């Protein structure tokens, strides 16, 4: 398939348009060129966006795909009227039916979804991020009891990015702790974790993938060798089984999939779905 451009247009950051659009595009086997156009909050900026869209249409000989979460109806009308792209108005698809169902009108407020700077949710997320950073890779045992979840696994199995995603996306205090050769020799969890067994969730990974990741960091080392990775994974999984720890393989899963699975398993009481 020849080159095709996808635009994500918003009068805010464009993150919602891009996230939703990418979820839809993932259903199709092609790799478009992505262009995010955030803060399109005036008619002048709308016309600038239109020029970019129409230029792509002319160069590529195909209509660009345009995902939009524009709230301002005047700006949206300008885009609809003058752009030569296939327009997918994601808010428009849902707002009108919801207005009808709820019997109330949308306030069409720009940035309402992301305007969290004054909210408790925002404060909770900042606190959770700071907590997760302070408890990354077992660097602090202080207040482990305050963790919503404690991730364990061998080095480079995905603990840190998952912890930070849980903190940033859900406001969860996620600690993570490495399982190291000394733990395998003792055949026991690190002593600091034992009192918090119910909060522990394990991450494992295919040895081949682990070796590949470690070689990017420390090539040709014992640490990154396939034999060592196989040994560590075998011991870590055996420990998780002995200790009755819930666990999953991160080998083929995205951070979002890993986090969603963890949430389904731990179901923190304070988290509303």
Curated annotation (Swiss-Prot):
Instruction: Tell me its EC number(s), please.
Output: 2.7.11.33, 2.7.4.28
Catalytic reactions of this protein:
[pyruvate, water dikinase] + ADP = [pyruvate, water dikinase]-phosphate + AMP + H(+); [pyruvate, water dikinase]-phosphate + phosphate + H(+) = [pyruvate, water dikinase] + diphosphate
Q: Which UniProt keywords apply?
A: Kinase, Nucleotide-binding, Serine/threonine-protein kinase, Transferase
Query: Which domain of life does the protein's organism represent?
Result: Bacteria
Q: Which InterPro entries match?
A: Kinase-pyrophosphorylase, PSRP
Chain positions recorded as ADP binding sites: 153-160
Q: List the Gene Ontology MF annotations in alphabetical order.
A: ADP binding; ATP binding; phosphotransferase activity, phosphate group as acceptor; protein serine/threonine kinase activity
Q: What does this protein do?
A: Bifunctional serine/threonine kinase and phosphorylase involved in the regulation of the phosphoenolpyruvate synthase (PEPS) by catalyzing its phosphorylation/dephosphorylation.
Q: NCBIfam families in the record, alphabetically?
A: PRK05339.1
In the record, the note on similarity to other proteins reads: Belongs to the pyruvate, phosphate/water dikinase regulatory protein family. PSRP subfamily.
- Supply the name of the protein: Putative phosphoenolpyruvate synthase regulatory protein
């Amino acid at each position: 398939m020849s080159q095709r451009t996808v635009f994500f247009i918003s009068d805010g950051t464009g993150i919602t348009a891009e996230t939703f659009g990418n979820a839809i595009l993932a259903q199709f086997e092609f790799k478009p060129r992505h262009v995010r156009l955030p803060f399109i909050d005036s008619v002048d900026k709308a016309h600038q966006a239109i020029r970019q869209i129409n230029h792509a249409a002319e160069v590529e000989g195909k209509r660009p795909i345009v995902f939009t979460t524009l709230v301002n109806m005047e700006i949206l009308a300008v885009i609809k009227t003058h752009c030569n792209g296939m327009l997918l108005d994601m808010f428009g698809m849902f707002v009108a039916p919801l207005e009808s169902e709820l019997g109330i009108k949308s306030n069409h407020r720009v940035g309402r979804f992301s305007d969290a700077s004054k909210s408790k949710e925002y404060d909770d997320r900042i606190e959770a991020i700071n907590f997760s950073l302070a408890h990354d890779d077992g660097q602090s045992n202080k207040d482990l009891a305050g963790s919503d979840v404690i991730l364990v696994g061998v080095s480079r199995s995905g603990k840190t990015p998952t912890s930070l995603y849980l903190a940033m996306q859900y406001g969860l205090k996620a600690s993570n702790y490495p399982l190291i050769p000394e733990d395998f020799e003792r055949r026991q969890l690190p002593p600091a974790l034992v009192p918090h067994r119910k909060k522990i969730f394990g991450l494992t990974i295919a040895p081949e993938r682990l070796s590949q990741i470690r070689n990017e960091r420390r090539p040709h080392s014992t640490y990154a060798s396939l034999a060592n990775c196989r040994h560590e994974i075998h011991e870590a999984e055996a420990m998780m089984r002995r200790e009755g720890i819930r666990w999953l393989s991160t080998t083929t899963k995205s951070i979002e999939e890993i986090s969603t699975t963890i949430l389904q398993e731990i179901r923190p009481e304070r988290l509303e779905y």
